[in-house]
């Protein structure tokens, strides 16, 4: 009865007629979350949160557990698909002015922050070489927090160094945070249904609407089919393409690779952090690389909502996308010239976008006034 009620309410939901394919990523993210929770549940049955057994338990899952290789690869590749979808979702919201729905936008950024924390804790669990070093570096950044830094680092690590209690804590957090992501997603959807969705033209969405089913259902199903096809293709043929070779070795505190490289979806923030030759400054820049998204509703100055009819703002937007890709690339390189210089310049350009974004709006408003 409840399911029928939900399906009926979703099917009859009034939706703007002119939303494009870029609006499909919300439903794709819901499917990604469901896949991650389902595969994570089966993996947790066989995983052992112990520094001497964690790496071996992953090997056991892949080699001995029936379809364990599929669960492990779906979970790992699914995380990458999840972040690819959420970054596109955020970029769409940025381009089409969805951030003007302040509550919906803020809840979305909270989901992104929680998701990044979940992914970080999950990356540590295999206890490979890169997992161990990532845990060491990131937990050490907490020491930069005034007054509470040392206490928080000791509490999260479960001691004065990364050890068995750290892995147990990370496993517990990795299990509980998806529930928080699900709860925040529910709030995000409720707020979205309260305000309605934006549209490519930035016009009043209440002027022209149609019911969600069947017009938008089939459009969503097409994109979901493409998503699942890509996910299964990568899982079946090139499952290790996104994995770091260092992480195929068991963690050894006495061995340090040439440079530390997290998963690709953290690389842009990591590049910003390491471009500043100061621990406190790097930690602050790392946090601000995401937190600065909260400022967008406050700095919107244009009379037009979207960037569809704003060429100058479009130029800034695509500069931001290029900067994001450049930061991702530089983070894969060693900390040496010229890569450090490029990452510093790209970091400056990244934050400059948010400072300069109000300027085109002010110029447009001035030039569009009637004589």
From Swiss-Prot:
Per its database record, what is this protein's job? Component of the ubiquinol-cytochrome c reductase complex (complex III or cytochrome b-c1 complex) that is part of the mitochondrial respiratory chain. The b-c1 complex mediates electron transfer from ubiquinol to cytochrome c. Contributes to the generation of a proton gradient across the mitochondrial membrane that is then used for ATP synthesis.
Span-the-membrane segments of this chain are: 25-45, 69-90, 105-125, 170-190, 218-238, 280-300, 312-332, 339-358
Name by which UniProt lists this protein = Cytochrome b
Record localization:
Mitochondrion inner membrane
Protein's GO biological process: mitochondrial electron transport, ubiquinol to cytochrome c
Q: Which residues are involved in binding heme b b562?
A: 75, 174
User: Which Gene3D superfamilies does the protein's record reference?
Assistant: Cytochrome Bc1 Complex, Chain C
Explain how, and how many, cofactor molecules are bound. Answer: Binds 2 heme b groups non-covalently.
Q: Does the keyword Glycoprotein apply?
A: no
Q: What are the recorded GO MF terms, alphabetically?
A: metal ion binding; ubiquinol-cytochrome-c reductase activity
- Source superkingdom: Eukaryota
Traced from the root, the source organism's taxonomic lineage reads:
Eukaryota, Metazoa, Chordata, Craniata, Vertebrata
Q: Which residues bind heme b b566?
A: 89, 188
Query: Which additional comment does the entry carry?
Result: Heme 1 (or BL or b562) is low-potential and absorbs at about 562 nm, and heme 2 (or BH or b566) is high-potential and absorbs at about 566 nm.
CDD domains linked to this entry: Cytochrome_b_N
UniProt keyword NAD present: no
Cofactor dependency = heme b
The UniProt similarity line reads: Belongs to the cytochrome b family.
Which positions are annotated as binding a ubiquinone?
Answer: 193
Q: Which UniProt keywords apply?
A: Electron transport, Heme, Iron, Membrane, Metal-binding, Mitochondrion, Mitochondrion inner membrane, Respiratory chain, Transmembrane, Transmembrane helix, Transport, Ubiquinone
Task: Describe its membrane topology.
Answer: Multi-pass membrane protein
Q: How does it assemble?
A: The cytochrome bc1 complex contains 3 respiratory subunits (MT-CYB, CYC1 and UQCRFS1), 2 core proteins (UQCRC1 and UQCRC2) and probably 6 low-molecular weight proteins.
One GO CC term of this entry? respiratory chain complex III
């Amino acid at each position: 009865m409840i399911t029928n009620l939900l399906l009926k309410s979703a099917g009859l939901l009034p939706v703007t007629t002119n939303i494009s394919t870029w609006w499909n990523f919300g439903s794709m993210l819901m499917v990604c979350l469901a896949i991650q929770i389902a595969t994570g549940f089966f993996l947790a049955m066989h995983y052992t949160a112990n520094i001497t057994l964690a790496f071996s338990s992953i090997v056991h899952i892949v080699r001995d557990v029936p379809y364990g290789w599929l669960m492990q690869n779906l979970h790992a590749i699914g995380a990458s698909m999840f972040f690819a979808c959420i970054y596109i979702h955020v970029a769409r919201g940025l381009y089409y002015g969805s951030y003007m729905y302040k509550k919906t936008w803020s809840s979305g950024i909270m989901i992104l922050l929680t998701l990044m924390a979940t992914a970080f804790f999950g990356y540590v669990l295999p206890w490979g070489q890169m997992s161990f070093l990532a845990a060491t570096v990131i937990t050490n950044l907490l020491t930069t927090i005034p007054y509470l830094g040392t206490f928080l680092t000791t509490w999260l690590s479960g001691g004065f160094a990364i050890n068995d209690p750290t892995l147990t804590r990370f496993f517990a957090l990795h299990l509980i945070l998806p529930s928080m992501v699900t709860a925040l997603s529910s709030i995000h959807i409720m707020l979205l249904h309260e305000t309605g969705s934006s549209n490519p033209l930035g016009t009043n969405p209440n002027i022209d609407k149609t019911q969600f089913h069947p017009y938008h259902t089939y459009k969503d199903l097409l994109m979901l089919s493409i998503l699942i096809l890509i996910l299964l293709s990568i899982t079946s043929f090139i499952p290790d393409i996104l994995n770091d070779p260092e992480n195929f070795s068991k963690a050894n505190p006495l061995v340090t690779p040439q440079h530390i490289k997290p998963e690709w979806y953290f690389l842009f923030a990591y590049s910003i952090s390491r471009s500043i030759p100061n621990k406190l400054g790097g930690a602050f820049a790392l946090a601000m690389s995401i937190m600065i998204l909260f400022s967008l509703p406050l700095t919107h100055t244009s009379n037009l909502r979207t960037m569809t009819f704003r060429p100058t703002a479009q130029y800034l937007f695509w500069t931001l996308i290029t900067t994001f890709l450049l930061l991702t690339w530089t983070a894969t390189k060693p900390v040496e010239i010229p890569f450090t210089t490029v990452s510093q310049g790209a970091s400056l350009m990244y934050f400059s976008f948010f400072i300069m974004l109000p300027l085109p709006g002010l110029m447009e408003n001035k030039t569009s006034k009637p004589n």
